[in-house]
């Protein structure tokens, strides 16, 4: 304090001066660690470092919105934080020793952000090996990421829910869409979808050659054309009887055939390819071991002008077939197989 005694004039006057001693060794500003919140919470307690001595610290909003309870308190409470990323800066003014600043961010996640949904399965046919995915949208700062679970694929942008994937291999390619939603209850959710790539060169359906069996045999092995996954083949019975061991195996066994004609269809489904659905049939003829041997019936005598008669050949069990033929003389059969 400076005091001036001016006698009877103006008397005694004084004035004070303050000298602030700043600490040159004081630590630079440290705003503390980043924080994550989830709605409905929009408040947080900050953790800046305390100024030393007469130095002064001040919080400011660099990005987003927020209200400080005390902008000069390193451990103040901040409220009204906006959804997304809010950046707060802690600045320490250390007088002639200098000013330092540090920033921290508060990420406010949305509790209403939907769980991960990878979208519907998709089918393409070579030469196409790409597709546009349809993952669920995310609300920042939540983040979604595509990854390959099975097969192959290259994502144009693995964080874009609607990214394009290329280089998918023939078969089933499984992709996962994983959404990270911070500290919310649904903090980490995932879902998968399949991209089926069908081969345009997959052969059309062939049920194999017809077969003939004789009882007591009532089973056989079918010979359908092979399929290239994800194409599928399916056997069905359309006449007769038969139990198919594995309806999707082109070379499955079939049992319980009945005497006569048993017909099976081999259907190949090749997705969106030009030969998407093709079919072929195979006939399995089961002959009766007990079918009678040929008997042309008794000899007959006719007198002109009658030159017609009814023959009496032995009966037969289908698929056995009888055939009349002329050995000597002449004759015309109304039905040579009757």
Explain the meaning of each model-derived region.
Residues 4-10, 93-97, 180-186, 269-275:
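Short, solvent-exposed loop/turn segments at the edges of extracellular beta-sandwich modules
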Residues 13-22, 101-109, 188-198, 278-287:
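C-terminal edge beta-strand
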Residues 25-33, 112-120, 201-209, 290-298:
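Proline-enriched interdomain boundary motifs that mark the N-terminal boundary
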Residues 41-52, 75, 128-139, 162, ...:
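A short beta-strand segment in extracellular, disulfide-stabilized domains
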Residues 58-73, 79, 143, 147-160, ...:
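Low-complexity "stalk/linker" and mucin-like segments enriched in Ser/Thr/Pro/Ala/Gly
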Residues 73-87, 160-174, 249-263, 338:
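Solvent-exposed segments in extracellular or luminal domains encompassing
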């Amino acid at each position: 304090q400076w005091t001036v005694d001016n006698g009877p004039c103006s008397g005694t006057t004084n004035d004070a001066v303050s000298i602030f001693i700043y600490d040159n060794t004081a630590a630079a500003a440290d705003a503390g660690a980043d924080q994550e919140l989830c709605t409905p919470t929009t408040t947080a307690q900050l953790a800046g470092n305390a100024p030393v001595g007469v130095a002064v610290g001040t919080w400011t909003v660099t990005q987003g919105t927020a209200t400080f309870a005390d902008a000069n308190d390193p451990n103040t409470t901040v409220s009204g934080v906006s959804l997304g990323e809010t950046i707060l800066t802690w600045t320490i003014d250390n007088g002639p020793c200098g000013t330092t600043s540090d920033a921290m961010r508060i990420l406010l996640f949305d509790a209403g952000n939907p769980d991960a949904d990878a979208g519907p399965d998709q089918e393409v046919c070579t030469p196409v090996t790409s597709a546009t995915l349809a993952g669920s949208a995310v609300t920042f700062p939540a983040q979604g990421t595509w990854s390959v679970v099975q097969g192959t694929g290259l994502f144009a942008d693995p964080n874009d829910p609607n990214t394009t994937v290329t280089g998918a291999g023939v078969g089933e390619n499984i992709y996962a869409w994983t959404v990270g939603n911070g500290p919310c209850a649904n903090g980490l959710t995932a879902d998968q979808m399949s991209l089926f790539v069908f081969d345009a060169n997959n052969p059309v359906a062939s049920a194999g050659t017809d077969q003939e069996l004789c009882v007591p045999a009532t089973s056989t092995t079918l010979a359908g054309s092979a399929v290239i996954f994800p194409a599928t083949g399916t056997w069905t019975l359309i006449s007769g009887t038969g139990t198919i061991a594995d309806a999707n195996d082109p070379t499955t066994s079939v049992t319980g055939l009945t005497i006569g004609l048993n017909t099976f269809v081999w259907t190949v489904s090749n997705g969106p390819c030009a030969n998407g659905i093709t079919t072929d049939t195979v006939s399995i003829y089961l002959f009766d071991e007990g079918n009678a041997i040929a008997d042309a019936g008794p000899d007959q005598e006719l007198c002109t002008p009658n030159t017609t008669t009814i023959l009496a050949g032995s009966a037969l069990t289908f698929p056995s077939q009888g055939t009349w033929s002329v050995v000597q003389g002449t004759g015309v059969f109304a039905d040579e197989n009757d």
